């Protein structure tokens, strides 16, 4: 595995993997220091009126307010075309399949839709995932000041904006919740392992 991270966010007509449609996907690749590589991609995918009409009320309002619903109607991009565009961008920065983990916020939901609709993209990514929401949940339990002090998130509910927010959020946790660089000494690490005892 290499140090780069593939950040993906999807917008869907809902969260039901059995029936809802993937209507927007964005991707950014970062290095291990969370610097964005390249311009990234943000693709709106066409869905028919029946799929849009089946959205739950809260999702309907969210996508109408963001302008996504109108863009979905106007888009002529298919799932297969979107998948190839995302893969082309990722391959520029991650030339070997299976080496970079997927990163994002509550990323398992996105991964489910990617696995269903974009199998080539799914298999190009490493099976491991870095979920910023896991760090958020641990911070809430262990470091509530960090949790409650986190920067406010925007409410764009658009894929590329959501990725940028996730990267910003992980930068925040890195500076507040993780051990400062260069990290613990070898002897400090050994002491923690000894304290934990055998498995």
Curated annotation (Swiss-Prot):
This enzyme's EC code(s): 3.1.15.-
Q: Which GO terms describe its molecular function?
A: 3'-5'-RNA exonuclease activity; nucleic acid binding
InterPro entries, from UniProt?
Exonuclease_RNaseT/DNA_pol3, Oligoribonuclease, RNaseH-like_sf, RNaseH_sf
| Domain Exonuclease: start-end pairs | 5-170
Looking up Pfam families in the UniProt record yields: RNase_T
Source species, domain of life = Bacteria
Which EC class is this protein assigned?
hydrolase
- The answer to keyword Repressor applying to this record is no
Q: Which GO terms describe its cellular component?
A: cytoplasm
Residues at the active site: 127
**The keyword Cytoplasm is assigned to this record:** yes
Provide the alphabetized UniProt keywords.
Cytoplasm, Exonuclease, Hydrolase, Nuclease
**Subcellular locations according to the entry:** Cytoplasm
Q: What is its biological role? A: 3'-to-5' exoribonuclease specific for small oligoribonucleotides.
Q: Which family does it belong to?
A: Belongs to the oligoribonuclease family.
Q: What is this protein called?
A: Oligoribonuclease
Q: Which gene encodes it?
A: orn
